[in-house]
């Protein structure tokens, strides 16, 4: 090797190692009392704070996170949106990639910081997301994003400014909050025989209040047509904005169980008690970055579907689920539990204090949430600006509705990947039909016709280490197996199971890989293949510019109309990956399935420290 070639090799190795630095983090998980909305309860703290610390890394960093469980209950940490390529043992899913971290023990997660973008981490043990273990992750990219920003502005100064703003964004972790712990909340449903999903607050960065604007006000804030289309005439919400718990349209059925609404404690469904506390304040500086600011939103909600807007400010949505998209300008956007959004805002309004409106937009409850975006130096000024959303998340004008992002279906969700990235056309190599819905009780949910995914499924013998443990057992109905290098279609059907003809949305998240949503339509799936469906209903498919994400929404079905969705992905990351609804009540009730991707190339060289 020549001296020059040797020098080039040394330089290349230097820059590779510079990019791939090792970053060590420590997370200490404790159980303490707190009052994020002004009302005390016990919750999870991470390193003494709630929500958990924001973690910022560079693409391809070698990450080592040591988690100390200092609670009296089990825990794991899932790195939501990270692909865990070649490190499935660090995904953080009990029963699939590890055993739960028991009280007093620790676990070391090791993985590459990949892919770049806006992600988050959270607990994955039972319903403990309700208790507060969640935080933002930002992986700064190595690649050039000029082509992304130039779709927003052709000005070179703007392009440079947006790159700087995206490198150092504001983080907004949005969560819903209940006065009850996860164990208490679930017990209310099982004791009463009713699925209960009434909340108390929307929090931003762990801060919020309990609002009690009155029953008449909340009734007037219902989404137009919701009661007429979905509920009996005259249905009224409570003074917390919640629908009556014993409505058949809410609970489904009939089920062979006893309904005991009298066992729902006071203040769960009604009996609102207001509390003044504080809302999050985001201070922005229009003198920096040519007046551009980037905001990373994490929907760490457990039930709610969040809408967000900033009074008088439009924004460019440029990233969803850690995937860059061709930017589009909106005044409000809806995001489902589990999703992450990144937006770019031009600070071109009169300096002042502007309300950020972040209500629950779903049909589950009328519930407002707020934060403040304050221009630097205007912290003590009165609020200014024009509202785009009402307290309950309704657009304040037809023009607002026209310029809002709704992820309901193919014809309204036009957020195509940047740079272009589309799946293989035609038939996939494998197709799996999954029928979603309730079985046996209002709180029992399945992803495969009848099988309920237990909260402790394979906890003692995780499938990464025992991939054949469920064969020849009934539990094999909770497992799908795919081959490495194959294209897979997951066909999800809702509103066809007995007793579940009216179905709320499900927020479906797949670990280990993102999926393209290539199809969405009404009716019962009765096609022999996806290719046949494409030929018969081409208007319901998009294989040229479909979105690419790790969390997708299914349809809100009213009055027995069935819906289906088709998601396509490529298998190149062998391991056991959970596919589940990100509504905590639904996952707790059984809405999950284990996908063993690449069983013919199963990981063999698992580090000894992870061996079970």
From Swiss-Prot:
A molecular-function term among this protein's GO annotations: copper ion binding
Residue stretches making up the Plastocyanin-like domain: 29-142, 171-359, 468-598
Keywords: Copper, Glycoprotein, Metal-binding, Oxidoreductase, Repeat, Signal
InterPro entries attached to this UniProt entry: Cu-oxidase-like_N, Cu-oxidase_2nd, Cu-oxidase_C, Cu-oxidase_fam, Cu_oxidase_CS, Cu_oxidase_Cu_BS, Cupredoxin
UniProt enzyme class: oxidoreductase
One GO cellular component term noted in the UniProt record for this chain: cell surface
Binding residues annotated for Cu cation 1, in chain numbering: 78, 509
Family affiliation: Belongs to the multicopper oxidase family.
Function: Laccase; part of the Pks1 gene cluster that mediates the biosynthesis of an anthraquinone derivative pigment that contributes to conidial pigmentation that provides protection from UV radiation, heat and cold stress. The polyketide synthase Pks1 produces 1-acetyl-2,4,6,8-tetrahydroxy-9,10-anthraquinone though condensation of acetyl-CoA with malonyl-CoA. The dehydratase EthD and the laccase Mlac1 further convert the anthraquinone derivative into the final conidial pigment.
Protein name as catalogued: Laccase 1
Species assigned in the record: Metarhizium anisopliae (strain ARSEF 549)
Lineage, broadest ranks: Eukaryota, Fungi, Dikarya, Ascomycota, Pezizomycotina
């Amino acid at each position: 090797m020549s001296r020059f070639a040797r020098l080039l090799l040394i330089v290349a190795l230097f820059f590779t190692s510079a990019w791939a630095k090792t970053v060590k983090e420590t997370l200490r998980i404790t159980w303490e009392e707190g009052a994020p909305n002004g009302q005390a309860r016990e919750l999870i703290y991470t390193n003494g704070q709630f929500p958990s610390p924001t973690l910022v890394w560079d693409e391809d960093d070698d990450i080592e996170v040591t988690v100390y469980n200092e609670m009296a209950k089990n825990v794991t940490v899932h790195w939501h949106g990270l692909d865990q390529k070649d490190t499935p043992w660090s995904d953080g899913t009990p029963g699939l990639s590890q055993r739960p971290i028991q009280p007093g023990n620790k676990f070391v997660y090791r993985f590459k910081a990949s892919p770049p973008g806006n992600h988050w981490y959270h607990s994955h043990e039972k319903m403990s997301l309700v208790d507060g273990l969640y935080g933002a992750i930002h992986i700064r990219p190595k690649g050039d994003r000029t082509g992304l920003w130039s779709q927003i502005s052709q000005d070179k100064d703007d392009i440079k400014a947006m790159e700087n703003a995206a490198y150092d964004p504001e983080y907004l972790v949005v969560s819903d909050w209940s006065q009850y712990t996860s164990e208490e909340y679930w017990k209310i449903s099982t004791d009463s025989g009713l699925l209960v999903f009434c909340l108390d607050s929307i929090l931003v960065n762990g801060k919020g209040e309990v609002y009690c604007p009155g029953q008449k006000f909340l009734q007037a804030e219902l989404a137009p047509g919701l009661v007429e289309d979905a509920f009996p005439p005259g249905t009224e919400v409570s003074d917390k904005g919640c629908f009556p718990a014993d409505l058949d349209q809410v609970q489904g059925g009939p089920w062979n169980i006893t309904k005991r609404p009298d066992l729902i404690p006071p203040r769960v469904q009604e009996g609102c008690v207001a509390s003044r506390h504080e809302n999050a304040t985001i201070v922005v500086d229009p003198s920096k970055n040519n007046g551009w600011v980037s905001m990373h939103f994490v929907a760490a909600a457990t039930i709610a579907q969040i809408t967000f807007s900033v009074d008088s400010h439009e924004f460019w949505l440029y990233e969803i689920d850690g995937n860059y998209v061709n930017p589009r300008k909106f005044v409000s956007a809806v995001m489902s539990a589990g999703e992450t959004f990144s937006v770019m805002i031009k600070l071109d309004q009169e300096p002042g204090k502007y309300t950020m409106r972040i209500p629950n937009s779903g049909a589950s409850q009328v519930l407002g949430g707020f934060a403040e975006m304050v221009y630097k130096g205007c912290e003590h000024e009165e609020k200014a600006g024009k509202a785009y959303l009402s307290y309950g998340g309704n657009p304040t004008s037809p023009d607002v509705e026209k310029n809002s992002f709704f992820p309901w279906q193919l014809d309204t969700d036009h957020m195509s990947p940047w740079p272009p990235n589309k799946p293989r056309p035609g038939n996939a190599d494998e197709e799996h039909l999954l029928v979603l819905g309730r079985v046996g009780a209002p709180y029992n949910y399945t992803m495969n016709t009848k099988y309920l995914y237990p909260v402790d499924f394979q906890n003692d013998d995780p499938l990464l280490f025992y991939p054949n443990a469920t064969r020849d057992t009934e539990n094999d109905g909770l497992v799908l197996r795919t081959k490495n290098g194959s294209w897979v279609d997951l066909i999800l059907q809702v509103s066809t199971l007995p007793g579940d003809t009216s179905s709320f949305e499900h927020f479906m998240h797949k670990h280990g890989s993102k999926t393209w949503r290539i199809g969405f339509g009404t009716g019962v799936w009765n096609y022999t293949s996806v290719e046949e469906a494409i030929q018969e209903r081409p208007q319901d498919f998009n294989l040229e510019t479909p979105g690419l994400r790790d969390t997708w929404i299914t349809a809100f079905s009213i009055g027995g109309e069935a819906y289906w969705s088709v998601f396509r992905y490529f298998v190149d990351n062998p391991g056991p990956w959970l596919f589940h609804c990100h509504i905590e009540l639904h996952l707790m009730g059984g809405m999950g399935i284990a996908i063993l991707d690449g069983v013919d190339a199963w990981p063999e060289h698992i580090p000894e420290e992870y061996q079970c």
